Amino acid sequence: MIENLKKRFPVFEKNKNLVFFDTAASALKVDSMIKAVNECYSYEYANIHRGIYELSSNLTKRYEDSRLTVSKFINSSSFENIIFTKSATEGINLVSSCLSDNYFNDGDEVLLTSLEHHANLIPWHLVSKKLKSSQLK
């Protein structure tokens, strides 16, 4: 099963014994994703949500359709609940900022483990400083 899965990742063609643990920073890409991105960049790339011309309209529709696909995949109540970010770090910064602005109150506590990645510690540390007498535990 693993060998069949590895066949979908071109990197293993030249690196047969590679064990890759850096996925949080940059995930390996499957061949179908590489092909789709290459085709998009080559034949239909445009700014999404920025133009009324055909390329932009078409790509905007595909982008929004992907939001619906993800929504269905994770059984979300609405595609509007799906937000794309460029990284997990950007995502956790967005979540911590939105929660601190809209849901947290002075004195609230944020609980974290000692195993958190630095990119998850800093946003919550900033939240605790922003809210008077809040604690990061």
Enumerate the predicted regions with their spans.
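Pyridoxal 5′-phosphate
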Residues: 1-137
